[in-house]
Amino acid sequence: MKYAVIGNPIDHSLSPVMHNANFAALNDLSSYEAINIRNEDFHRIKEIINDKALSGFNVTIPHKERIIPYLDEIDEQSKTVGAVNTVKIVDGKWIGYNTDGIGYVTGLRQVYPDLEDAYILILGAGGASKGLANELKKFVRPKLTVANRSMDRFESWQLEVNKISLQEAEAALSEFDIIINTTPAGMNQNKEVIINLDNLDSHTLVSDIVYVPFKTPILEIAEAKGNPIHNGLDMFVYQGAESYRIWTGELPQIQIMKDTVLKYL
C-alpha cells in the first residue's frame, strides 16, 4: 500500500520518516511520501492522488479545509471542526476524518490522566481549537473556556464553551488546571507569547500543540516559573497513529514512531 501527506510547503514534514519507521517495525512493505501541492494546483487533487495509486493520505496546512469538497464522506469530528487531516480511499471512495483532537487528547492523558474534573483554558478559536475542544468535551465535566483576541472568531462555533477575551483570560489564569495554546504564536521564528502568565498558578499544566520548536516561548516561560509543560509532539505522533489505524485497522508501533521523530528534533 502507498500513503502520503499533502501540503504546501511540505519539505519540513516528519510524517514520512515517522510512518515509514512504523511500517519497517511491522514488516509492512507499505510506503509513505510527502507531496507538495500548490494552492493553484489543488483542483487537480484527484488526478494527482490517483496517479500515485494511494490507499490513503494525510492533509496538512493549508489544505485541511480545501479538501472537503473533493470527499465523498466525512466523519462527525470533521463536520464539527470544518477540517480534514486524514483521507481513506476505499474502492475509489474518499472518506475524510479529523484525528487532531483524539491525537492531542490521547497525548495529554499521558501526562495528565485525571482530566475529568480539570478546568481547561484553550487559547485561540481556530480549527485546531475546535478539534481539541470537541474531543476534550468527551472527558471533561467542567465547561471548557476558550479565549481569543477577536470575539468575531466565535461566530462559527457550535460547541457550548465559555467564550472570553485574552484580557479576561489573563485575569482569571489562576483558576485553570490546564492551559492549551492552539495559536501559531511561538512557531518557527515567531517569539510572540499570546498571553501574560503573571497570574499563573504553580500547579497549572501549560501545553502547546506546536512541537517545532520543542519548547515554544510560552512553554519556556511556564517552565521557568516551575510549571509542568507539555508540547505538541504527542499530538503529532498520536494523530499519525490514529491515521494508521483508520487506514489499516491495525495498531501501530507508537513508541517507535515517537522515538523516530525525536531523532529529528
UniProtKB/Swiss-Prot annotation:
<dbReference type="GO" id="GO:0019632">
    <property type="term" value="P:shikimate metabolic process"/>
</dbReference>
<dbReference type="InterPro" id="IPR013708">
    <property type="entry name" value="Shikimate_DH-bd_N"/>
</dbReference>
<dbReference type="InterPro" id="IPR036291">
    <property type="entry name" value="NAD(P)-bd_dom_sf"/>
</dbReference>
<dbReference type="GO" id="GO:0005829">
    <property type="term" value="C:cytosol"/>
</dbReference>
<dbReference type="GO" id="GO:0004764">
    <property type="term" value="F:shikimate 3-dehydrogenase (NADP+) activity"/>
</dbReference>
<dbReference type="InterPro" id="IPR041121">
    <property type="entry name" value="SDH_C"/>
</dbReference>
<feature type="binding site">
    <location>
        <position position="209"/>
    </location>
    <ligand>
        <name>NADP(+)</name>
    </ligand>
</feature>
<keyword id="KW-0560">Oxidoreductase</keyword>
<protein>
    <recommendedName>
        <fullName>Shikimate dehydrogenase (NADP(+))</fullName>
        <ecNumber>1.1.1.25</ecNumber>
    </recommendedName>
</protein>
<feature type="binding site">
    <location>
        <position position="232"/>
    </location>
    <ligand>
        <name>NADP(+)</name>
    </ligand>
</feature>
<dbReference type="Pfam" id="PF01488">
    <property type="entry name" value="Shikimate_DH"/>
</dbReference>
<dbReference type="InterPro" id="IPR046346">
    <property type="entry name" value="Aminoacid_DH-like_N_sf"/>
</dbReference>
<keyword id="KW-0521">NADP</keyword>
<dbReference type="GO" id="GO:0009423">
    <property type="term" value="P:chorismate biosynthetic process"/>
</dbReference>
<comment type="subunit">
    <text>Homodimer.</text>
</comment>
<dbReference type="InterPro" id="IPR006151">
    <property type="entry name" value="Shikm_DH/Glu-tRNA_Rdtase"/>
</dbReference>
<feature type="binding site">
    <location>
        <begin position="13"/>
        <end position="15"/>
    </location>
    <ligand>
        <name>shikimate</name>
    </ligand>
</feature>
<dbReference type="GO" id="GO:0050661">
    <property type="term" value="F:NADP binding"/>
</dbReference>
<feature type="active site" description="Proton acceptor">
    <location>
        <position position="64"/>
    </location>
</feature>
<dbReference type="GO" id="GO:0009073">
    <property type="term" value="P:aromatic amino acid family biosynthetic process"/>
</dbReference>
<comment type="pathway">
    <text>Metabolic intermediate biosynthesis; chorismate biosynthesis; chorismate from D-erythrose 4-phosphate and phosphoenolpyruvate: step 4/7.</text>
</comment>
<comment type="similarity">
    <text>Belongs to the shikimate dehydrogenase family.</text>
</comment>
<feature type="binding site">
    <location>
        <position position="76"/>
    </location>
    <ligand>
        <name>NADP(+)</name>
    </ligand>
</feature>
<feature type="binding site">
    <location>
        <position position="85"/>
    </location>
    <ligand>
        <name>shikimate</name>
    </ligand>
</feature>
<dbReference type="InterPro" id="IPR011342">
    <property type="entry name" value="Shikimate_DH"/>
</dbReference>
<dbReference type="InterPro" id="IPR022893">
    <property type="entry name" value="Shikimate_DH_fam"/>
</dbReference>
<dbReference type="GO" id="GO:0008652">
    <property type="term" value="P:amino acid biosynthetic process"/>
</dbReference>
<feature type="binding site">
    <location>
        <position position="60"/>
    </location>
    <ligand>
        <name>shikimate</name>
    </ligand>
</feature>
<feature type="binding site">
    <location>
        <position position="100"/>
    </location>
    <ligand>
        <name>shikimate</name>
    </ligand>
</feature>
<keyword id="KW-0028">Amino-acid biosynthesis</keyword>
<comment type="function">
    <text>Involved in the biosynthesis of the chorismate, which leads to the biosynthesis of aromatic amino acids. Catalyzes the reversible NADPH linked reduction of 3-dehydroshikimate (DHSA) to yield shikimate (SA).</text>
</comment>
<dbReference type="Pfam" id="PF08501">
    <property type="entry name" value="Shikimate_dh_N"/>
</dbReference>
<feature type="binding site">
    <location>
        <begin position="124"/>
        <end position="128"/>
    </location>
    <ligand>
        <name>NADP(+)</name>
    </ligand>
</feature>
<feature type="binding site">
    <location>
        <position position="211"/>
    </location>
    <ligand>
        <name>shikimate</name>
    </ligand>
</feature>
<dbReference type="Pfam" id="PF18317">
    <property type="entry name" value="SDH_C"/>
</dbReference>
<keyword id="KW-0057">Aromatic amino acid biosynthesis</keyword>
